[in-house]
Design a protein with these regions (language model features):
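Flexible, glycine-/charge-rich segments associated with ATP-binding catalytic modules
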Residues: 1-26, 87-92, 96-97, 208-215, ...
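ATP-lid-like helix-loop hinge signature
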Residues: 156-206, 273-277
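Flexible loop/turn segments at secondary-structure boundaries
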Residues: 41-42, 202-204, 262-265
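Helix-loop-beta hinge of the Bergerat
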Residues: 103-136, 204-205, 210-227, 245
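P-loop NTPase nucleotide-binding core
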Residues: 72-116
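Conserved short strand/loop->alpha-helix "switch" segment adjacent to the catalytic nucleotide/phosphoryl-transfer site
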Residues: 40, 44, 127-150
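Conserved ATP-binding N-box helix of the HATPase_c
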Residues: 50, 139-181, 241-247
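Amphipathic alpha-helical interaction surfaces in cytosolic regulatory modules
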Residues: 4-88
Length: 292
């Protein structure tokens, strides 16, 4: 089976179209995802494609092939070290040593975190990267971003541990991102993107193990944003109340998908604008992306 990723800016906004093909996959069938028409990738899209590939892998038992990758997208995926994902086989184009397309994006290799001691090291490394990328920012900014890493990865590990037959797992990456505004514009300031993904039980099942009040995936996300707790370690629930304060202070954006629902939040000093979306197909686990 071949899945053709269309020429679109945000792959993650249309992942449902690819999920529809999951039911047709047979055991032992090789699934190929064709990137030849893809012109743009961001960490959140890559994370969702990893989770999508995991779902196809679990159905077929065969590694999912990523093929037809344009050279500039291949360069980006190489920096992420996508080849370390064990259920994906990446068919990279030949790369000339001189092909070092310079741009304003800096990204750390994809991190695979499977336990909490490993999370401590990842958080410290995140602080180091942020201090290097944003030397003009205060330590509070770097600490805020590191706290987001700590809270969200803890959620993913907790959700994975509770998922039958699934080992604790969270993929995440951090990218320095330069918006495409004219130099000198007040919007030109570099920003940071942090993206996470797991294939665990998701927010609704996690919340209902303690509260039994989330009737839908959308209501579960809303409850988490209000600060409802569910994490088994007793350390602040899902941490979104704390995370929301960080985003409000930095006028950030938050996108969460869990199962069949997603919310995009834009934080300002005085308000939070939310765009809710219901999906016909359910993506495993929870995927979260931050921009601030």
């Amino acid at each position: 089976m071949e899945i053709q990723l269309k020429n679109q800016k945000y792959i993650d906004s249309n992942v449902d179209r690819y999920l529809k093909q999951l039911s047709a996959v047979k055991s032992g069938e090789r699934v190929t995802i064709d990137f030849s028409q893809v012109e743009y990738l961001r960490p959140g899209a890559v994370i969702q494609l990893i989770v999508l590939s995991k779902m196809f892998f679990e159905k077929s038992g065969e590694k999912v092939v990523w093929s037809g990758i344009p050279k500039d997208r291949a360069f980006y995926l190489r920096r992420l070290q996508i080849e370390q994902v064990e259920f994906i086989s990446v068919m990279m184009p030949p790369m000339l040593w001189a092909y070092t397309r310079r741009d304003n994006e800096t990204v750390i290799p994809l991190e695979k975190i499977t336990n909490r001691p490993q999370l401590g090291c990842a958080t410290a490394q995140a602080m180091d990267h942020l201090r290097e990328w944003f030397p003009e920012e205060s330590d509070d900014f770097c600490r805020d971003a590191a706290n987001i890493v700590m809270e969200i990865v803890n959620n993913s590990l907790d959700h994975s541990e509770r998922c039958e037959g699934n080992s604790p797992l969270c993929y995440y990456t951090i990218q320095k991102y330069q918006p495409h505004y004219p130099i000198g514009s007040k919007c030109y300031k570099p920003r940071v993107i942090i993206a996470f993904g797991d294939a665990g039980i998701g927010m609704r099942e996690s919340l209902n193990r303690r509260w039994n009040i989330a009737q839908t995936d959308m209501s579960a996300i809303e409850l988490a944003l209000k600060g409802y707790s569910c994490r088994s370690d007793g350390e602040g629930g899902m941490g979104f109340r704390r995370v929301s304060e960080v985003l409000k202070k930095n006028k950030g954006h938050l996108t969460i998908r869990s199962g069949g629902a997603s919310i995009h939040c834009v934080y300002d000093e005085d308000e939070v604008r939310r765009n809710r979306r219901y999906h016909k197909e359910r993506l495993l686990g929870t995927q979260t992306a931050f921009l601030f």
